[in-house]
Amino acid sequence: MDKNNKITPECQGLLDEINSPKYKAIFISGFYDLRMGGQPVPRFNAQASFIDNFKTRFVETVKLLAKSKSVYIFANNSSISRSPIRGYLLGKYGLEKYLEPIRRMGDIDASNKIIHDLVKDIPNVYWVDAQQYLPKDSVMAEGKYLYGDQDHLTNFGAYYMAKEFSKYQRVMTPEQVKKLYE
């Protein structure tokens, strides 16, 4: 969407592709807080990631997409201050003690609440907050690393989050899954 909430010419082809029968559902995930200009991640140029009037443009984009498809919006995961793998590798040489402790960056729950509140009343839109099942005070579970770097989960981290999520919630109802294969 442009600043006037209209599809830009360069995005029209993407919208046509999305609206084709090829896709049954749309999944959206992103650094929402970075796009809104809050809680910038220090290693990124925050201004380069900021989108003017992001909230309105995001809502209008989601509404447009949800007219023809189910839209699943995934909550953002926390970023952490450094890769936990760095400590593991430096530990082989006794150097991990010189690293700053890992900490979560920003308040991802507050950022996710903003996005949830923006989309919660849009028909055909589903909010998925799997990150709430990651430990808040550790980057490990079951003795394994959850994060491979500052932003991305390891394969185990993704598995762990999905396993915990599936104990309490489902992304799709059985009816929605059936509809995907019709």
From Swiss-Prot:
Pfam families: SGNH (PF19040). It comes from the Bacteria. This is Uncharacterized protein HI_0391. It comes from Haemophilus influenzae (strain ATCC 51907 / DSM 11121 / KW20 / Rd).
